[in-house]
Structure formats: structure tokens, C-alpha cells
Amino acid sequence: ICACLVGSEMCIRDSSDTEQYVYGLEAGRILRKIHSIPAPATQEDWEIRFNRKMDYKIKKYVECPIKYENGQAFIDYINENRHLLKNRPQVYQHGDYHIGNMMIGRGGQLHVIDFNRNDYGDPWEEFNRIVWCAQKAPLFASGMVNGYFDDNVPMEFWRLLALYISSNTLSSVYWAIPFGQDEVNTMLNQAKEVLSWYDNMRNPVPTWYFKGYYLQYIDGIPFKLKSTFDFSFMKEYGTVFKVYDDQDSGNICFGTEKDGQRYFVKFAGAPTEQYGGDPADAISRLKATLPIYSDLKHENLIELIEAKEIGDGFAMVFKWADGDCMGRMYPAAYRRFIQIPINDRLAVFSDILSFLECVVSRNYVAIDFYDGSIMYDFVNGKTTICDIDLFRKQPCVNDMGHMWGSSRFQSPEEHQLGADIDEITNVYTLGATAFALFGEYNRTREKWQLSDKLFEIVTRAVSDDRANRQQTIRQFTAEWEAAQ
């Protein structure tokens, strides 16, 4: 069973950066195999054939009543670079090779479909549809180019691709007219975007292009790093089935399975791609979180099993918690989450209230607590809180100016150097979380899905004036429960 790469739960935009890039690499390698089939010897010379095609498109564009803003840049680039067509090879072409004609199998394999427009021509001309890929997923598009050329992309390719895209874009506007204004507007916007990528056709390398990640594999799972690192020690925790490599904290995380049990391993010490600091500092920070997880044990907090120095770094091992993160940075999971019944979301919020009451009762304050810290098991209806690494003991003062966390969940004092960060701050956090759960992050009455009374309570909680908020988590909880 396959799912289309766009427009499904396994949509490319819902994949991690690494997954998008790796799928692109595979798409490029598949295309290279397709292009291994030569064209018949009787095929018309490519230079003659494509020049005729471009002349026709220029003529139709000039006659078209609708013009692109600075569309002349496409024509000028074509006329200045026709010589690039000389002596180009010809091969079998898929004919419509782009992200919409690919599918992902249940096992994660990439498949190419819809060969009904197959043709013969310059293999590099086949990339002209990459415009659609780059608009939806630049990392996928970059991977496709890098995979095709084994990370050694010649400049001549970029110059020719710009020629082919110029030709293709010219024809799009007059092609769209019979389909109505919406289709015309789509092509006008696309042309504007293409011109921005190429600096009005002055730079043949588009701005969306990314030279790629350093990829490493563990148990067949790809992940990105700055440079190679020995993860052989991970065998101690079983087989890796998932890698989380997008953190900017210096940590990299793994889902593992051993003897029928699953674990979540958080490791510091590797040269992670998103982290700009010293791995030694990441190790120190991760070690400092150990007492936090020990002090704040709660039925909804992810369960810490062990922590130790290993593999020239430091690892914390947790019991695996099934579920999806409710954060908007995970679009597929978020869409599922906002569709669950209100009563289930109320139960999630009740779990969050209980956990934050536990936090303040043990003389801590929640910092960097946001939707990305909340997981929900859709099968068993269980809430799990994770990633509390930056919680602090009271008293706490803002010593950063702009503290760690998502601005959608942060109180004004979390942006004010020297301000107290305390239980009243976490009342604001609760209010912001309620708006995320029951208002789709919007703080207007129109979007609010519960009663007027509950809306008033939550609006007080997110007041910029600390004195107007509920002064304790317990006060907020009492008001919330009384109003339900």
C-alpha cells in the first residue's frame, strides 16, 4: 500500500529535514537509472529540436495578453544561452518527473509512477519540473540533484537547467488561460518565485539549492551530523528504529528496541548538525538535567531509567512513550490532535495542570515548556510530558534577556533581563497552552471552543500584567474546574 508523497499523512512536508533530503537523494538516483536507457539513433538532433520548441514558446508568450513582471529576463537568458544545447546527449525520459508523481510504500520505500508522458531528450532537461519540488520541499529538490550527481554537481548543469526552466516558465502563463484566473495566478506567482531564485536570471544556481548534509546511518536509519561519530555503543540499547537529529541543543535522540522493550536514548557529545556550540558544553548541560527528572517524577512525565557516561559522551535512557507530539512543528500529528474530541483534549489539559502543580510543589519553575513538550498516545489516550531539561529551581531570575522557549508560550518577563521567573510565569504558560489546545493558538473568542467563563479565566492567565493573572497554579486550577 502506498501513500502519495504530497497530500497524505506521509506528506513530504511532514517529514523531518533528514527524511526530506534522503527521499530526494533516492529520487535523484532513480532518475539516473531511468536515464541509463539511450534514445534511438534516429532521434532528431537535440539542439535543432529544442531551439524550435523555445522559438515557439517565445512567440506564444509575446502574443499572450498576460505578461510576467520582468518576463523579458527569461527570453534574454534563453537567447544568450542557446549554445549550451550543442552536442547534448539524449536518453529515455519519464516525461513528468516531480514530487507529485512519487509514492512512499508502507515500508518507507520511494516509488515513481505515471510514465504516460515518457519521451526522449536531454537527461538534464528532465529536471525542469523540479520547480514544483522546490516550492514544496527545497531539501527534497536539493537531494534529488545531489543524488543524481553523487554530490558533484557541474556548473554546466545549473546553466542548462536555468535555460530549460526559463523555457518552461514562459509557456506556463498562456497554457493556464483556458483553465481560469486561479490557474493564471498560480503561474504568475510561480514565475515571480522563479525569478527570485535566479536573481532575475543573473545567477544560474537557484537560492533554494542546499549542498547537502553529512549523513551517517545506524541500523539502516539515516541521520545528519557535522562529521563522522562512532555510535557503536548504541548496540547496548538494542536496534535503532528512529533518530531525532533536528535539535539545536547539542543532543541527538534515538528510539531503540531490545528484548521486546522500547527505549528513548538522549545523547550528548556528538557533532550534531544543528548545534553551533562545543559538544563538551552539551554534555555538561545534559548531565545537569539528571536531578530535574529525578525530582519531578510524575505519572505523566517520561520515565528515566538510567544515565551514564558512554561513547565519549553522556546518555540518558528513558522508557519509550508511545504517542505523537502535539506541536505545530509536527504538522501531521498536530492535525490529528486538534481533531480529537474536546473531552479528550480536556483530559490532556488536566494532566498538564497536574504536572505543573507537581513542578511548583517541588520548588521548580517550568522553562521552555511548550506544545513540543507534550505527547499524546491516540490509541491509549495517555498524555506524556517530555523534554524538561531547562526547568529550574526557585528562586529564578531571567539571566538571558530572551529565555529559551517558544514565543507563543512565553510571558513578557521571559523577555526581560532581571525579571522574576516564578509560579505566576507558569500561570501564563498554562493560559497559552489552553489557547493552543482549545483555540488553535488564536486568543480570540471566535476561535475559542469552550465556554465564555473559561475564556475569561484563560485570558486573565495570559495578561501581560502579572498582577492581573491568577497568582498560583492552584488558583488557576480551582477557577478552571469550577467553571466547567
Predicted regions and their residues:
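Single conserved hydrophobic/aromatic residue that forms the stacking wall/gate
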Residues: 1-7, 12
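A cross-family kinase active-site recognition segment
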Residues: 14-69, 88-90, 119-120, 371, ...
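Helix-rich C-terminal or lid/interface subdomains of diverse kinases
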Residues: 21, 25, 86, 129, ...
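Active-site Asp-x-Gly
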Residues: 90-92, 105-158, 388-413, 420-427
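Catalytic-loop of the protein kinase fold
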Residues: 92-94, 99, 356, 360-377
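Juxta-kinase regulatory segment immediately upstream of eukaryotic protein kinase catalytic domains
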Residues: 208-241
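ATP-binding glycine-rich loop module of kinase domains
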Residues: 241-243, 249-291
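Short beta-strand micro-motifs within the conserved protein kinase catalytic domain, predominantly
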Residues: 303-314
